[in-house]
Amino acid sequence: MKTTTFANRHIGIGEEELPLMLKKIGVSSLDELIEKTIPANILLKEPLKLGAAMTEREFAEHIGKLAAQNKLYKTYIGCGWYDTVTPAVVQRNVFENPVWYTSYTPYQAEISQGRLEALLNFQTVISDLTALPLANCSLLDEATAAAEAATMMYGLRSRAQQKAQANVLFVDEEIFPQTLAVIRTRAIPQGMVVKVGSYKDLTFTPDIFGCIVQYPNNSGSIEDYREFTEQAHAVGCKVAVAADILSLALLVPPGEWGADIAFGSSQRLGTPMFYGGPSAAYFATRDEYKRNMPGRIIGLSKDKYGHLCYRMALQTREQHIKREKATSNICTAQALLATMAGFYAVYHGPDGIKEIANHVHAVAFWLAEQLTKLGYKLQNENFFDTLRIQLPNNVTIQEVRTIALSKEINLRYFDNGDVGISVDETTTQADATLILNLFAVAAEEPMHDVCAIPGKAPVAAQFQRLSTYLTHEVFQKYHTETEMMRYIKRLERKDISLAHSMISLGSCTMKLNAASEMLPLSNAAWMNLHPLVPEDQAAGYQTLIHNLSEQLKTITGFAGVSLQPNSGAAGEYTGLRVIRSYQESIGQGNRRLVLIPASAHGTNPASAVQAGYEPLTCACDENGNVDLEDLRAKAEAHKDELAALMITYPSTHGIFEEEIKEICEIIHACGAQVYMDGANMNGQVGLTNPGTIGADVCHLNLHKTFASPHGGGGPGVGPICVAEHLVPFLPGHVSTGNLQNEVSAAPYGSAGILPITYGYICMMGAEGLRRATQTAILNANYLAACLKDAYGVVYRGKNGFVGHEMILECRKIHEESGISENDISKRLMDYGYHAPTLSFPVHGTLMIEPTESESLAELDNFVDVMVHIREEIAEIETGKVDKEDNVLVNAPHPEYEIVGDAWTHPYGRAKAAYPIQSVRDNKFWINVARIDNTLGDRKLLPTRYGSFE
């Protein structure tokens, strides 16, 4: 084994282990396994044309040279992105820490208490600063949060408004341009009409159901929306506000002047700009709207012994359960960045946050005074951080731009000739003086002696915040680096991640996030670039984006790529919007139905609804495949209305369906398009591709197939790849003048993630990617062979093999022992493992996806654990142990119970805590017992201030 190649570091199975595994599976070679697993008519005939694989050192040099092409000017463009200081203790211990960035969404709450507490901190920060009682634990970005607010208000229309068909959304003209563009994209398929104008001039009419305003607004002006909000409420309209989260440390918060929803970006709470993302959007609202709010909510609960703990609350709202009835299609959001923003607030505390906000405001105030003295006219009387400057007659915008660039400064240039300056926490006296100097040079005015910037500046009384915030003790205690580091580590020890053991979640692809892929993200040249700088200042990013797009086109067999969607769900929505735009362009806008197999992930029907379609379910047969006759019958019956088929390949049942090309042909014969859900692309790369099977568009999950981390629930990236005829309808961006189908705030979405995937593809090369896919299929079939006798495998392909994942049968176990798949998942925690996917796509089962990154030793240990758990279940079935008091129904067993004085169970502590030798050698201690889900939903406590007393 040549260990110096990256592929051999990434792939867990060595050549010497291959014969043993193949023998267990019952094949003679990897090629034979693939030929018996994937239909012959879709196998690629030639290797991917991706160039030779780079070594880790070569990639480090390459990505370093690209980074050096980015020019880091001092940037005061603002418009939703601002330079900030990421505390080193947070960067080192969270952002660069695999325990935090390789963990999964905290559905298994007992082994996720650390990040659940961190996310509850974030929710508390948002709730306090907005003065609204309920916040979620992040959305994708500010613009998509605005679209979610619009959809939520539309769904909250009164019966009278629905009867009157009120469908007008008023958006104030002083909202960020990219936010308005994303709102428009969402509004069209939902049947909303967007009316843009000045809130001051609005006359409320019965057809208006909601309003969106910005605070401070696009020009930096702080507006008093109290009277406007009262007028809206008087006629039954809701009001949502996009609020600068840092400004709310000084300004009257939206909740105090009547807003129903507040949303925005938490980027300036310590998250770098990353050329547009990722950063965590926030969303807060009133308690009565908790079941209508998008995104995940963390809440308090208790474990079975009454200890306070954390969990994801109100999960039945989510798209994977509600499907087409869900209020949102959001799954992955921005958990890692929300965690960082929460820690930023913990580290600084209320006084520190206020000091930072005061500094920002004071710099802006100082600049306003000095610029006025030079003859410039301020267009916004009340401001927080942003000045809109009218130039004197003797100064042109081009002169200002030229002088600014000569001083390596970026400003914002409005279409009417005004200039914008948005300062931030990094802006120093020297920076502000240099800004002043460039305006003095432009006006040919001498620089007079200027006073120092004060520590704070006055805020007009009507806008001044008087209420307190961040009063919980967590925001008072950890202000030294030592204490902060220990707090982070204390939380970290409560969570299972890929740093601990395999996470075998089916359809989630929890593969290695290699250090060599992650390291570039800590380079300032990738971290600190504003997304709206001139392209020549982002040459490194532009080259990377071009190269990665070409790689993804090659891998998928498609002609075009958009990197804009910020998650897989966003990719689904975007792909469907592209289909709709194409069909409208050829006079087929009447197509309104999307066929979706019954086995599909709930995001598919939820995304279809968001894109303005009506889902139509087609059946699956007893083997888990799409029922071809049902598909054909429904497609032909609705031939003129059918827009698309959404299909996952390999299927959500873990099978490569033999008839996939015929399925696509049936849809195309009806004049419709095929959307391939790329969630399972890890079973395709290098062996087949969406273009070959006959799809027209697919999304990819970079956080699954292409090695970017899950981050405990985000960030994700969901780029879409499309066939030639769909390329003209890919998303544009307001900054380029192309407003078509814009779906995220930044032109390239979460561009800061892209170096990870680029590194993965460059270092794996075509052969490495192909071998990774082969190994993923090998590992899944090995586990199936090892566990089939103990549990049973629900679905197999026609030759008896599974794809890159497989479904374990647990329903018979439940019938005979009373032990559920949930009990098995909780018992796995005692063994140091995260559960596989529960009850999806088949109720009462466990879906397992080992990925290519796991070693044979880890696979064998997992098999030992699963077999041992099956033996524990057998003891219940035979009556050897108590059906009501055993290691499974009582799992997990927290440390405090194991070491406690009282022990009332009929089995010993050692059996509970150390069931096999591998656990004795490396025990992961759990800090809570099984959590009461009902209590946490019945009484939602979504901040750190909650209490069940």
Where are these regions (language model features)?
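Non-catalytic terminal extensions of PLP-dependent enzymes
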Residues: M1-K24, K36-Y76, V85-Y101, Y107-E110, ...
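Short helix-loop-beta connector
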Residues: L132-P133, G557-A559, G587-N590
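Conserved phosphate/anionic-ligand binding catalytic regions in large, soluble enzymes, centered on
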Residues: T271-A284, E288-Y289, A333-L337, S422, ...
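General small-molecule cofactor/ligand-binding pocket signal
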Residues: A135, V193-G197, Q379, R412, ...
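Conserved PLP-enzyme active-site core in the AAT-like
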Residues: G114, T144-C309, L371, F384, ...
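A conserved hydrophobic secondary-structure block that centers on an alpha-helix together
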Residues: V125-A146, Q165, L169
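N-terminal export/assembly segments and adjacent metallocofactor-ligating motifs
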Residues: T105-R115, N121-Q123, N136
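TRNA-binding/sensing appendages of the translation machinery
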Residues: V27-N41, A259-G264, A695-C698
